[in-house]
């Protein structure tokens, strides 16, 4: 079960919500509220304000983060669920993500959204990264089923393409490195390539995310580009994508990030996914996607 770290001030602010002044929550009260998420307080650093919380609910990955815990407590306090406008059906979605043919044999699914207006804080960035790692490692089975990429939105020119390329066809500077590398070199040299490269083993083409100018965003599920994929404190325009092998899990993971960023004050906008093959969501769909909305599923002949 996941154990997460968070800042007490950050949790209190998220429980209060954007329109209220946060107040100090006694630890004994917090421990009672954590029962709502099957959580247990494992540690508290009074000097730094850090809380360590162990979560026991393996069926609720949306609770494996500061935002999810605060959301559940807020719902209990107010007696009503939270409505997110980005789940409403959009008449027109401005930004597109195009999936190339052939990815259905390797890593077929992708979901994405943008989030604008939340200026990333130190606590917020720590939570984004922690949630990214927990979901990819536990829910995403060490990135095999789900992996997540976070980017600075401003440099990206849409439409974004989810492409297949040869291992030596594309070069970029990956996070954690100072030099430009091919995908083959990343798999051989970069620590993340060595750790996760087996996911892509046996394929003579590899997945890459690029924008309309040809700028590389990432080599999923391995590593982001350093130029675009290194979110920093103070950034207020983000692009989030999730790739994987299970479409509902990919979409759910994207939903979690969208809700978390919205809870921090971001305006989340959907991205339209265009697939060359028919999926459970069709050939075109927008994410985030409301799993509670009615949906027509064609019967097999």
Where do the language-model regions lie?
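RNA/tRNA-interacting regions in translation and RNA-turnover enzymes
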Residues: 1-301
């Amino acid at each position: 079960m996941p154990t997460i770290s968070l800042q007490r001030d950050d949790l209190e602010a998220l429980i209060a919500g954007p329109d209220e002044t946060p107040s100090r929550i006694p630890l004994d009260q917090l421990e009672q509220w954590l029962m709502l998420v099957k959580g247990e307080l494992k540690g508290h650093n009074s000097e730094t304000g850090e809380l360590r919380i162990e979560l026991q609910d393996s069926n609720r990955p949306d609770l494996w983060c500061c935002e999810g815990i605060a959301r559940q407590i807020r719902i209990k306090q107010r007696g009503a669920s939270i409505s997110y406008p980005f789940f409403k059906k959009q008449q027109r979605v401005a930004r597109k993500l195009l999936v190339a043919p052939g990815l259905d044999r390797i890593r077929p699914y992708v979901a994405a959204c943008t989030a604008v207006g939340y200026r990333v804080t130190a606590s917020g960035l720590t939570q984004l990264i922690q949630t990214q790692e927990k979901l990819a490692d536990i829910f995403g089975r060490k990135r095999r089923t789900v992996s997540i990429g976070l980017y600075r939105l401003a440099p990206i020119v849409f439409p974004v393409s989810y492409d297949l390329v040869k291992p030596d066809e594309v070069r970029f500077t990956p996070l954690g490195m100072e030099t430009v590398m091919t995908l083959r070199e990343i798999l051989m040299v970069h620590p993340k390539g060595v750790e996760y490269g087996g996911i892509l083993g046996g394929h003579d083409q590899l997945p890459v995310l690029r924008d309309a100018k040809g700028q590389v965003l990432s080599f999923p599920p391995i590593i982001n580009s350093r130029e675009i994929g290194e979110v920093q404190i103070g950034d207020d325009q983000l692009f989030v994508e999730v790739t994987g092998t299970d479409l509902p899990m990919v979409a759910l993971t994207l939903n979690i990030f969208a809700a978390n960023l919205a809870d921090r004050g971001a305006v989340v906008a959907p991205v339209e996914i265009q697939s060359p093959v028919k999926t459970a969501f069709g050939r075109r769909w927008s994410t985030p996607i409301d799993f509670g909305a009615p949906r027509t599923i064609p019967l097999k002949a």
